[in-house]
Regions:
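Active-site-adjacent loops and short helices of periplasmic peptidoglycan-processing enzymes
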Residues: 16-153
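Residue-level signal for helical boundary/lining positions with a hydrophobic bias
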Residues: 11-12, 46, 196
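Intrinsically disordered, low-complexity boundary segments flanking structured domains
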Residues: 12, 53-56, 174-175, 183-184
Length: 246
């Protein structure tokens, strides 16, 4: 299906869109491109990289595997993946990579191998966090990456949570308190049909977000790359969630 999707969007891609950002809105169930702008522009994707980090980690680790954080300090793979997807934790990405067989370089190689497997020729990773300017892709290929990431129950469940809670003991008894706030918390609180969400930002990548939503009992993938401000990115996301349906 995704080879067909990438072919369709290449055929119908705009050739002269006067916009600095890249956009794709894609209906998964009908295999229909609803909207696209600069869908094949190769650009940095910042922390959207972490979707591939999560895929490679979930293919190798069990959620209760204990990974070395530093000498005599450990964290489970599940805890690190939660921090990775909710807080967009760069350190969690590095720990997941360093504990991989063969270390960090082997983990990054596995990320790029997975991109080849998914038929994403313009997608390249040089680190597990997305901080590097050469972690690049296109809006079209990010949409495909979101689809593949959504096949993992853990990614869907965790990345759609506005907050992750923990139980702490206080003088008034045990209470739930948020331990992680999602980087797209405002949108996740505002809309109850977001099934997966990941943001990204570096000075070179701009403000980025990708989501899978459910609308009219059909799944849609939204990708926005390269907006100059968080407010503009989120307002555009609101418009695309509210307006587009096929």
């Amino acid at each position: 299906m995704w080879k067909l999707f990438l072919t369709i969007i290449l055929v119908f891609a705009s050739t002269a869109v006067k916009a600095n950002h890249s956009i794709v809105v894609y209906n998964v169930d009908t295999n229909t491109v609803i909207k696209e702008q600069n869908a094949w522009t190769v650009r940095p994707i910042a922390s959207i990289t972490k979707l591939m980090t999560a895929i490679v980690a979930l293919e190798h680790y069990k959620l209760d595997d204990k990974l070395v954080v530093r000498k005599k300090q450990y964290a489970t793979a599940g805890t690190l993946l939660t921090s990775l997807l909710v807080r967009s934790d760069n350190q969690a990405a590095e720990i997941l990579a360093k504990n991989y067989p063969g270390g960090r370089s082997a983990f990054i190689a596995a990320m790029n191998d997975q991109a080849v497997k998914y038929n994403l020729p313009n997608t390249r990773f040089i680190d597990p966090s997305g901080l590097g300017v050469f972690n690049t892709s296109t809006a079209a290929e990010v949409a495909a990456l979101v689809y593949f990431a959504s096949e993992y129950d853990f990614v869907r469940t965790v990345s759609a949570q506005p907050e992750i809670y923990t139980v702490v003991k206080t003088k008034y008894g045990y209470k739930e308190r948020p331990v992680y706030n999602h980087t797209s918390k405002e949108l996740l609180v505002e809309f109850d049909n977001i099934l997966l969400s990941k943001t990204g930002y570096t000075s070179k990548a701009g403000r980025c977000i990708t989501m899978m939503i459910e609308k009219n009992n059909q799944k849609q993938i939204i990708v926005i790359l390269g907006e100059p401000t968080k407010q503009r990115r989120d307002n555009l996301a609101r418009q695309l969630i509210a307006q587009n349906s096929l």
